[in-house]
Every structure is written in C-alpha cells, then in structure tokens.
C-alpha cells in the first residue's frame, strides 16, 4: 500500500510513511453499513497531523460496496476508509492513491458526466467538453485532464477506452485511462496530470 502510494505520488515529490498501526477492537466497524458508522469510525483513534486510514472488511455506507471513501478538505470528519479487498493487491495498486487524491481535494475526472441521454450524449450541465471549452469551470475544473464520460466498464484489459459516447458538441471522447482520479480499470491507473499535482501540493501546504 505505502509503496504503491509513494510510486504514484513520486511525480509530485511526495513521500509517505507509516507512522503507526492501531487495531480497533470493535465488531461494529468490521462492516460499515451507513454513513453514521463511517463517521464514527473516522473519529476513532485519530492521530493529528497525519492521514488516518482505516481498513475494514466491507465498506457499503450507501448500500453499495465501495473500495474506498475519503474526506475532502472541507469535510467535517476527516480520514480515509478502505475495504480490505481493495487494499495493496497486485491487481489493484491504485485505489489508495485515488482516495488520497480526494483527500488532497482532487475531483473525479468524470465529474459532471453522469447524465447521458438516450442517444449516448453526455449532456450534464457541468460536463466537460472534449474541445476544452470552459474547462476551468467544467468537469474536474482542470484543463490538462481530458474530458471523461466516466470510464467505469469502458476500459479493456489493454487499458483502451471502448466507449462510444459523445459530448454536448457531438465530439467523441478520448479520455486518459491512466489517470488516477478516473474510474478506469484499477490496474491501468498510475498518473496524475501536472495541474492535479499542483493542487495536491497547494492543498498540502495551505490546508
């Protein structure tokens, strides 16, 4: 986990290390079923001035199993919770880095792209356009991450995008399947853009 994290964040010149390990002897937190449990866990055994990461057997606060969930800078309760099935595995080296990206205030590259009409057009009110129009105010608000229609189920084993969605201008998507903040295949994700790295550093130094 830490080795993968350090590899993924090397471009931002960040290095992480494990400060300590605590076992929470409470069966309530083995399986997280709702957001109250999630917040209660993230207020347990908190170590200040560090990223508190909690590993549980099953993480399904909204009824659907998740690999991980993280706070943002503005969140009332801080910390990252990971499902053990998604932590530090050869076929999933990226989920922890993805969640730490959220911790540093990065958005999904497909932010705003959840709405699709019956013709396969991504027409969400905040969806980023392929040509980059108003890119600093759409999607993830970054201009060096290509428009992303949400890559879940649309990336093959060669890390190629297989979808055929078009944006509100009728342009076909050419997303970055390697970006850590996407929903690409977990084995494919290993990069941040320069603007993403800038946000990571800014958040670290100013929050």
What are these regions (language model features)?
Residues 25-27, 61-62, 113, 190:
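Short catalytic/ligand-binding loop motif for oxyanion handling, primarily in non-cytosolic enzymes
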Residues 41-114:
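Active-site-proximal segment of zinc-dependent metalloprotease catalytic domains
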Residues 1-51, 55-59:
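Propeptide-to-catalytic entry region of secreted or membrane-anchored zinc metalloproteases
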Residues 192-207:
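A recurrent domain-boundary module in secreted/ectodomain proteins
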Residues 10, 42-49, 71-76, 160-175:
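Extracellular/periplasmic catalytic domains that process cell-envelope and extracellular macromolecules
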Residues 87-190:
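The catalytic-center signature of Zn2+-dependent metalloproteases
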Residues 1-12, 103, 107, 203-206:
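Structured segments of extracytoplasmic/periplasmic soluble domains
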């Amino acid at each position: 986990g830490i080795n993968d994290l350090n590899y993924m964040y090397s471009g931002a010149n960040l290095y992480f290390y494990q400060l300590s390990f605590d076992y929470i002897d409470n069966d309530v937190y083995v399986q997280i079923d709702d957001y109250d449990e999630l917040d209660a866990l993230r207020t347990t055994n908190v170590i200040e001035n560090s990223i508190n990461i909690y590993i549980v057997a099953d993480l399904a606060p909204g009824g659907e199993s998740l690999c991980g969930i993280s706070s943002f800078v503005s969140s009332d309760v801080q910390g990252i919770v990971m499902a053990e099935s998604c932590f530090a595995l050869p076929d999933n080296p990226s989920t922890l880095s993805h969640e730490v990206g959220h911790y540093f205030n990065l958005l999904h590259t497909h932010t705003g792209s959840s709405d699709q009409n019956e013709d396969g057009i991504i027409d969400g009110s905040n969806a980023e356009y392929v040509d980059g129009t108003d890119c600093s105010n759409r999607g993830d608000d970054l201009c060096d991450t290509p428009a992303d229609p949400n890559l879940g189920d649309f990336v093959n084993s060669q890390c190629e995008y297989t979808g055929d969605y078009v944006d509100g201008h009728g342009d076909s998507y050419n997303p970055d399947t390697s970006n850590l903040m996407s929903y690409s295949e977990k084995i494919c994700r290993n990069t941040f853009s320069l603007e993403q790295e800038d946000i990571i550093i800014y958040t670290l130094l100013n929050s």
